[in-house]
A protein has these predicted regions:
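Short, hydrophobic-rich beta-strand element in sensory/regulatory alpha-beta domains
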Residues: 69-75, 279-282, 516-517
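Conserved small-residue
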Residues: 20, 67, 131, 149, ...
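Active-site-proximal acidic secondary-structure segment that organizes catalysis
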Residues: 16-18, 134-184, 423-437
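Generic non-transmembrane alpha-helical segments
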Residues: 59-66, 167, 171, 251, ...
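AMP-binding/adenylate-forming domain of the ANL superfamily
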Residues: 14-31, 52, 106-112, 157-158, ...
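Regions immediately C-terminal to embedded phosphopantetheine-bearing carrier domains
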Residues: 1-30, 447-564
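Adenylate-forming
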Residues: 14, 24-33, 42-50, 60-62, ...
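Short amphipathic alpha-helices and their capping loops
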Residues: 1-34, 57-105, 112, 125-127, ...
């Protein structure tokens, strides 16, 4: 059934709609300075090829204006104790910067993109979205988007990028696009009776009761004083070779498991193999779009769900996968249960501001990797910089088609001020080791580990050895034997996902800190060999400027000018 009628016209003739429980929770999180940056969903696309910037601005503007959620304004109705929103506000106006003509340096543009990605929104006054088109040159353009999570989930991001693509092609051709007419987000939210919710909460609580509310991570925590508290994050990634991937997925298929379930099993197994815990609560995001009417609606329908995984001393990989499948199906069925109510029953001493029962999360990585405006203009998504994280550890799983076959890609997001990168890398290596054991010894007990091979040390003071090390990593990642030292990674067949893997492998092999932006600036084998000759300096956390575009532009140039 549809939700209760809107609260009607206010004295200013606005029509207000009740926010969902998830949106209300996000509105509360947005009031906390520490958690506020985690409520943003930034996307940066780098286009290579000719771009009609007038057409792109028109496409972005129309995409931002046509969806009610992206015009929303929020307020707290104190009398009803209800967060509510209206959708009759003006949409965000995309900005345009000709960085080449105005003499912006790469560093200044990077500063601006970081600021656009981190600056908060005033949910009461501003549209919960911003966009900037940045012309870098005749064949290079950036599109920086940022939308508040309160109106935008992972599915919405794909929809918005697709809208921009369709609208751009139509604008460039001088024709009207064919687009759907999405319903208002408030019209597709089902309202449930309190009695039904209470009964379902009781069932979930009964299923999860007794499991520890914490997960013991095998990662030493860095002691910090309160002034250093931050949720600035980083990501490490790896992927299994096609042969191992095929064997892993064949075993998973025998137990009816999806790639997501494989990720949960690998995480639980690795935690059990590296620590004393055997009973885990693991969070994951559920799309929440069971109603077909939500198919074309940009909005926040996602919910956080928790599943339970236990591991016995004699459980084989087949046993673990079967347990994960059953637990996952139970969690899917109860995905509409409010997590805050479950958390309150199981962990009354929790931080009420951030209620999930688990500090670890597993998600299927379905983010788009490319956005092609036209056949001659390709776009790839840049890695997030900055990245903000709410969980102690978030595992993302993706089954990727590559030229040499399907690869199971795994990435770990973590807070950089809490965990050392080397320790997280060790845990990622342990995840790979677990995957290899699953593929090779599925009938063996999970807690019976195979022997790990040792790596051969490389003399990083030897320029020839550094070059050969980087060449070997490129050959491994690109699946190519002939690697030129002076050709960029992307011209050699790399993409953004493989770049993330390259960052991880260079850091792992060299023992040096390697950053994604470093590889953009040193895209060749020879450049990266020089890069790992010395450890990279740690990047400073960017300060979140006010959301005003003029202030962001000025701040970006000020930072860049100070560095020159």
């Amino acid at each position: 059934m549809l939700p209760a009628a809107p609260h009607g016209a206010s004295p200013s003739d606005h029509v207000w709609y009740p926010a969902t429980r998830v949106q209300q929770g996000m509105w509360v999180l947005d009031r906390d300075e520490l958690l506020r940056p985690t409520q943003l969903v930034p996307t940066v696309v780098e286009f290579t090829g000719p771009v009609d910037h007038r057409a792109l601005l028109s496409a972005v503007g129309r995409a931002l204006s046509r969806h009610p959620s992206l015009r929303a304004r929020f307020r707290l109705d104190v009398r009803r104790r209800q967060v509510e929103y209206r959708t009759d506000g003006p949409p965000a106006e995309p900005g345009f910067l000709d960085a080449e003509a105005e003499g912006w340096t790469e560093e200044e543009v990077d500063n601006l993109v970081r600021a656009l990605s981190a600056a908060p929104f005033d949910l009461a006054q501003d549209a919960p979205a911003r966009a900037e088109v940045i012309r870098m040159g005749a064949e290079r353009t950036l599109l920086a988007l940022n939308v508040h999570h309160i109106v935008f989930d992972g599915v919405s991001r794909g929809m918005l990028l697709e809208d921009i693509q369709i609208l751009y092609r139509a604008a460039a051709a001088g024709v009207e696009p064919r687009l759907s007419a999405p319903p208002h987000p408030a019209s597709v939210v089902a309202e449930r009776a309190p009695e039904e919710i209470a009964e379902q909460v009781a069932e979930v609580v009964d299923r999860l009761r007794g499991a520890p509310a914490e997960v013991l991570l095998p990662l030493p925590r860095t002691p910090l004083d309160g002034s250093a508290e931050s949720l600035l994050g980083a990501s490490l990634a790896t992927s299994l070779d096609p042969g191992t991937t095929a064997r892993v997925m064949a075993v998973a298929a025998q137990e009816g498991c999806t790639p997501f379930m494989v990720g949960v099993a690998l995480l639980a197994a690795t935690l059990a193999r590296t620590g004393p815990q055997r009973d885990f609560l693991i969070a994951f995001a559920w799309p929440g779009r069971d109603d077909p009417d939500t198919a074309d609606v940009i909005g926040m329908f996602m919910t956080t769900v928790v599943l339970r995984v236990t591991l016995g001393p004699e459980d084989t990989w087949h046993d673990l996968l079967g347990d994960v499948r059953v637990s996952g199906m139970e969690a899917f069925v109860d995905s509409d249960v409010p997590l805050d109510a479950v958390s309150a029953a199981l962990n009354p001493d929790r931080n009420a501001l951030w209620p999930p029962l688990s500090p670890v999360l597993v998600n299927l990585d379905e983010a788009p990797r490319s956005v092609d405006l036209t056949p001659g203009t390709t776009g790839r998504l840049r890695p997030l910089d900055p990245m903000f994280v709410k969980y102690d550890l978030a595992v993302f799983v993706r089954l990727e088609d590559t030229p040499d076959g399907r690869r199971l890609a795994l990435s770990l997001d973590y807070p950089v001020n809490v965990f050392d990168t080397g320790d997280v890398q060790d845990f990622l290596n342990a995840l790979r080791h677990s995957a290899a054991d699953l593929a090779t010894f599925p009938e063996n007990p999970v807690l019976e580990e195979s022997v790990r091979p040792t790596a051969t040390a490389v003399d990083l003071d030897d320029p020839a050895a550094r070059l050969e090390l980087v060449r070997s990593i490129w050959r491994e990642i690109l699946g190519a034997d002939d690697i030129a030292d002076d050709i960029s990674f992307f011209e050699s067949g790399g993409d953004s996902l493989l770049l993330v893997l390259l960052v991880e492998r260079l850091g792992q092999a060299s023992g040096r800190e390697v950053r994604t932006m470093d590889l953009f600036r040193s895209p060749t084998v020879s450049g990266q060999a020089d890069l790992i000759a010395a450890a990279a300096e740690p990047a400073a956390a960017p300060a979140a400027a006010a959301g005003d575009r003029a202030a962001l532009l000025a701040a970006a140039r000020t930072q860049g000018g100070a560095a020159r």
